Amino acid sequence: MKRLTKILTRTVAIVLTLSLMLGIGLLFYASIVMRGDRAAAISAWQNPAVSITSTDHSIVLTPTGAPSGAGLVFIPGAKVDPYAYLFKLTGIVEETGLTVVITKPTLNLAILDLRPLESFTADAPDVEQWIVGGHSLGGARACQIAGEADVVGLVLFGSFCANDLSNSQLTVLSIGGSGDGLSTPEKIQSGAQLLPASTTFVEIDGFNHADFGDYGAQSGDGESRLTSEEARAALTAELLGLFGAG
Protein backbone atom coordinates (compact mmCIF):
# COMPACT_ATOMS: atom_id res chain seq x y z
CA MET A 1 0.00 0.00 0.00
CA LYS A 2 2.80 2.41 0.87
CA ARG A 3 4.52 1.55 -2.38
CA LEU A 4 1.34 2.27 -4.36
CA THR A 5 0.89 5.59 -2.56
CA LYS A 6 4.47 6.55 -3.33
CA ILE A 7 4.01 5.69 -7.02
CA LEU A 8 0.78 7.70 -7.22
CA THR A 9 2.37 10.66 -5.47
CA ARG A 10 5.31 10.58 -7.84
CA THR A 11 3.03 10.27 -10.87
CA VAL A 12 0.91 13.22 -9.78
CA ALA A 13 4.06 15.28 -9.18
CA ILE A 14 5.36 14.46 -12.66
CA VAL A 15 2.03 15.33 -14.30
CA LEU A 16 1.82 18.63 -12.43
CA THR A 17 5.41 19.49 -13.31
CA LEU A 18 4.86 18.71 -17.00
CA SER A 19 1.62 20.73 -17.02
CA LEU A 20 3.42 23.67 -15.45
CA MET A 21 6.23 23.44 -17.98
CA LEU A 22 3.76 23.28 -20.87
CA GLY A 23 1.90 26.27 -19.49
CA ILE A 24 5.10 28.28 -19.14
CA GLY A 25 6.15 27.22 -22.63
CA LEU A 26 2.81 28.35 -24.09
CA LEU A 27 3.03 31.70 -22.34
CA PHE A 28 6.56 32.21 -23.63
CA TYR A 29 5.55 31.21 -27.17
CA ALA A 30 2.53 33.51 -27.16
CA SER A 31 4.54 36.42 -25.77
CA ILE A 32 6.71 36.60 -28.90
CA VAL A 33 4.47 38.76 -31.07
CA MET A 34 5.05 40.09 -34.58
CA ARG A 35 4.82 43.81 -33.86
CA GLY A 36 3.02 46.21 -36.12
CA ASP A 37 4.94 48.78 -38.13
CA ARG A 38 4.90 52.07 -36.24
CA ALA A 39 4.79 54.32 -39.31
CA ALA A 40 1.83 52.43 -40.77
CA ALA A 41 -0.07 52.65 -37.49
CA ILE A 42 0.62 56.38 -37.17
CA SER A 43 -0.68 56.90 -40.70
CA ALA A 44 -3.90 55.13 -39.72
CA TRP A 45 -4.31 57.19 -36.56
CA GLN A 46 -3.81 60.39 -38.56
CA ASN A 47 -6.42 59.49 -41.20
CA PRO A 48 -9.14 62.18 -40.84
CA ALA A 49 -11.78 59.85 -42.30
CA VAL A 50 -11.38 57.26 -39.53
CA SER A 51 -11.73 57.41 -35.75
CA ILE A 52 -9.80 54.76 -33.80
CA THR A 53 -10.54 53.79 -30.21
CA SER A 54 -9.18 50.99 -28.03
CA THR A 55 -11.18 48.93 -25.53
CA ASP A 56 -10.31 45.98 -23.31
CA HIS A 57 -11.57 43.62 -26.02
CA SER A 58 -10.78 45.29 -29.30
CA ILE A 59 -9.68 48.19 -31.46
CA VAL A 60 -12.64 49.92 -33.09
CA LEU A 61 -12.36 51.76 -36.42
CA THR A 62 -15.35 53.96 -37.17
CA PRO A 63 -15.94 56.41 -40.03
CA THR A 64 -15.96 60.10 -39.15
CA GLY A 65 -18.50 60.53 -41.93
CA ALA A 66 -21.83 58.75 -42.34
CA PRO A 67 -21.65 55.10 -41.18
CA SER A 68 -22.99 52.41 -43.48
CA GLY A 69 -24.64 50.44 -40.67
CA ALA A 70 -22.48 47.41 -41.45
CA GLY A 71 -19.63 46.11 -39.34
CA LEU A 72 -16.74 43.68 -39.65
CA VAL A 73 -15.32 41.80 -36.68
CA PHE A 74 -11.75 41.07 -37.76
CA ILE A 75 -9.64 38.45 -35.96
CA PRO A 76 -5.84 38.80 -36.25
CA GLY A 77 -3.50 36.03 -37.30
CA ALA A 78 -1.65 34.03 -34.66
CA LYS A 79 0.90 36.07 -32.70
CA VAL A 80 0.35 39.17 -34.83
CA ASP A 81 -0.08 42.51 -33.08
CA PRO A 82 -3.72 43.61 -33.63
CA TYR A 83 -2.48 47.15 -34.32
CA ALA A 84 -0.57 45.78 -37.33
CA TYR A 85 -3.85 45.73 -39.29
CA LEU A 86 -4.86 49.36 -38.75
CA PHE A 87 -3.43 50.83 -41.93
CA LYS A 88 -4.74 48.12 -44.27
CA LEU A 89 -8.26 48.16 -42.82
CA THR A 90 -8.73 51.93 -42.68
CA GLY A 91 -9.04 51.88 -46.47
CA ILE A 92 -12.41 50.12 -46.48
CA VAL A 93 -13.66 52.23 -43.56
CA GLU A 94 -12.78 55.39 -45.47
CA GLU A 95 -14.36 54.22 -48.72
CA THR A 96 -17.63 52.74 -47.45
CA GLY A 97 -18.40 53.90 -43.92
CA LEU A 98 -17.91 50.36 -42.63
CA THR A 99 -17.16 49.92 -38.91
CA VAL A 100 -14.30 47.50 -38.17
CA VAL A 101 -13.72 45.85 -34.80
CA ILE A 102 -10.26 44.26 -34.57
CA THR A 103 -10.21 41.75 -31.73
CA LYS A 104 -7.44 41.41 -29.16
CA PRO A 105 -7.14 37.59 -28.97
CA THR A 106 -6.38 35.76 -25.76
CA LEU A 107 -2.60 35.26 -25.53
CA ASN A 108 -2.42 36.58 -29.12
CA LEU A 109 -3.79 33.25 -30.35
CA ALA A 110 -7.26 33.26 -31.91
CA ILE A 111 -7.66 29.51 -31.42
CA LEU A 112 -7.52 30.05 -27.65
CA ASP A 113 -10.03 32.90 -27.70
CA LEU A 114 -13.41 31.36 -26.95
CA ARG A 115 -15.22 34.60 -26.15
CA PRO A 116 -18.55 34.89 -27.99
CA LEU A 117 -19.01 37.30 -30.87
CA GLU A 118 -21.08 39.65 -28.72
CA SER A 119 -17.98 40.37 -26.63
CA PHE A 120 -16.73 42.35 -29.62
CA THR A 121 -19.92 43.57 -31.28
CA ALA A 122 -20.82 45.24 -27.98
CA ASP A 123 -17.97 47.67 -28.65
CA ALA A 124 -19.90 49.02 -31.68
CA PRO A 125 -23.56 48.94 -30.59
CA ASP A 126 -24.83 51.09 -33.48
CA VAL A 127 -23.91 48.53 -36.14
CA GLU A 128 -26.98 46.87 -37.65
CA GLN A 129 -25.43 44.07 -39.69
CA TRP A 130 -22.34 42.03 -38.90
CA ILE A 131 -19.77 40.21 -41.00
CA VAL A 132 -16.90 38.25 -39.46
CA GLY A 133 -13.45 37.73 -40.89
CA GLY A 134 -9.86 37.13 -40.04
CA HIS A 135 -6.33 36.68 -41.23
CA SER A 136 -4.66 33.25 -41.32
CA LEU A 137 -5.63 31.33 -38.14
CA GLY A 138 -7.83 34.28 -37.25
CA GLY A 139 -9.86 33.43 -40.33
CA ALA A 140 -10.23 29.84 -39.15
CA ARG A 141 -11.63 31.17 -35.87
CA ALA A 142 -13.97 33.47 -37.81
CA CYS A 143 -15.32 30.40 -39.61
CA GLN A 144 -16.21 28.88 -36.23
CA ILE A 145 -18.32 31.85 -35.15
CA ALA A 146 -19.76 32.62 -38.59
CA GLY A 147 -22.82 30.52 -37.85
CA GLU A 148 -24.03 32.83 -35.08
CA ALA A 149 -27.45 34.36 -35.69
CA ASP A 150 -26.36 37.95 -36.22
CA VAL A 151 -23.73 37.13 -38.86
CA VAL A 152 -24.57 37.61 -42.54
CA GLY A 153 -21.15 37.20 -44.12
CA LEU A 154 -17.59 35.94 -43.85
CA VAL A 155 -14.32 37.33 -45.21
CA LEU A 156 -11.20 35.17 -45.27
CA PHE A 157 -7.92 37.07 -45.49
CA GLY A 158 -5.27 34.55 -46.56
CA SER A 159 -7.14 31.84 -44.72
CA PHE A 160 -9.46 28.85 -45.01
CA CYS A 161 -12.02 27.08 -42.83
CA ALA A 162 -11.59 23.88 -40.86
CA ASN A 163 -15.35 23.50 -40.26
CA ASP A 164 -18.01 22.88 -42.90
CA LEU A 165 -20.01 25.95 -43.94
CA SER A 166 -20.98 24.64 -47.37
CA ASN A 167 -24.70 24.57 -46.58
CA SER A 168 -24.83 28.00 -44.95
CA GLN A 169 -26.53 31.05 -46.46
CA LEU A 170 -23.55 33.28 -45.69
CA THR A 171 -22.10 35.68 -48.24
CA VAL A 172 -18.44 34.64 -48.35
CA LEU A 173 -15.39 36.38 -49.81
CA SER A 174 -12.02 34.63 -49.81
CA ILE A 175 -9.00 36.83 -50.56
CA GLY A 176 -5.65 35.22 -51.29
CA GLY A 177 -2.33 36.33 -52.66
CA SER A 178 -0.29 34.89 -55.51
CA GLY A 179 2.85 35.20 -53.37
CA ASP A 180 1.40 33.80 -50.15
CA GLY A 181 3.77 31.09 -48.96
CA LEU A 182 1.67 30.08 -45.94
CA SER A 183 -1.97 30.08 -47.00
CA THR A 184 -0.99 29.24 -50.54
CA PRO A 185 -3.48 29.47 -53.43
CA GLU A 186 -3.45 25.66 -53.51
CA LYS A 187 -4.36 25.38 -49.81
CA ILE A 188 -7.16 27.90 -50.21
CA GLN A 189 -8.61 25.99 -53.15
CA SER A 190 -8.31 22.67 -51.32
CA GLY A 191 -10.60 24.05 -48.61
CA ALA A 192 -13.15 25.46 -51.05
CA GLN A 193 -15.50 22.52 -50.57
CA LEU A 194 -16.12 23.65 -46.99
CA LEU A 195 -17.55 26.96 -48.20
CA PRO A 196 -20.84 27.76 -49.97
CA ALA A 197 -20.87 27.26 -53.74
CA SER A 198 -21.57 30.98 -54.11
CA THR A 199 -18.27 31.96 -52.44
CA THR A 200 -16.24 34.57 -54.30
CA PHE A 201 -12.53 33.73 -54.56
CA VAL A 202 -10.06 36.44 -55.51
CA GLU A 203 -6.28 36.33 -55.75
CA ILE A 204 -4.24 39.53 -55.59
CA ASP A 205 -1.22 39.39 -57.87
CA GLY A 206 2.09 39.98 -56.09
CA PHE A 207 0.44 39.87 -52.65
CA ASN A 208 1.91 37.69 -49.88
CA HIS A 209 0.72 36.52 -46.44
CA ALA A 210 2.15 39.45 -44.49
CA ASP A 211 0.63 41.99 -46.90
CA PHE A 212 -2.70 41.67 -45.08
CA GLY A 213 -1.07 43.62 -42.25
CA ASP A 214 2.04 45.66 -41.58
CA TYR A 215 4.33 43.60 -39.36
CA GLY A 216 7.37 42.80 -41.46
CA ALA A 217 8.49 39.56 -43.08
CA GLN A 218 7.06 36.27 -41.85
CA SER A 219 8.95 32.97 -41.83
CA GLY A 220 7.87 30.67 -44.65
CA ASP A 221 6.12 33.41 -46.59
CA GLY A 222 6.67 34.18 -50.25
CA GLU A 223 7.91 37.48 -51.62
CA SER A 224 5.68 40.51 -52.04
CA ARG A 225 5.96 42.69 -55.12
CA LEU A 226 3.85 45.46 -53.62
CA THR A 227 4.48 48.41 -51.36
CA SER A 228 2.29 48.69 -48.27
CA GLU A 229 0.29 51.45 -49.96
CA GLU A 230 -0.23 49.33 -53.09
CA ALA A 231 -1.26 46.33 -51.00
CA ARG A 232 -3.76 48.48 -49.08
CA ALA A 233 -5.28 49.80 -52.30
CA ALA A 234 -5.56 46.29 -53.77
CA LEU A 235 -7.14 44.88 -50.61
CA THR A 236 -9.60 47.77 -50.37
CA ALA A 237 -10.60 47.29 -54.01
CA GLU A 238 -11.47 43.64 -53.41
CA LEU A 239 -13.41 44.43 -50.24
CA LEU A 240 -15.42 47.06 -52.10
CA GLY A 241 -17.05 44.26 -54.07
CA LEU A 242 -18.61 43.00 -50.84
CA PHE A 243 -19.20 46.17 -48.86
CA GLY A 244 -19.95 48.55 -51.73
CA ALA A 245 -18.82 52.11 -52.25
CA GLY A 246 -19.91 54.79 -49.85
Predicted regions and their residues:
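Short beta-strand element of the alpha/beta-hydrolase
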Residues: 69-77
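The serine-hydrolase catalytic nucleophile loop
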Residues: 81-88, 185-186
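A conserved short beta-strand
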Residues: 150-161, 171
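Active-site-adjacent alpha-helix of alpha/beta-hydrolase-fold enzymes
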Residues: 176-230
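Short beta-strand/loop motif that positions the catalytic acidic residue
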Residues: 168, 173-176
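Gly/Ala-rich beta-loop-alpha elbow adjacent to hydrolase catalytic centers
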Residues: 133-142
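Conserved alpha/beta-hydrolase
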Residues: 89-110
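N-terminal membrane-anchoring alpha-helices
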Residues: 2-51
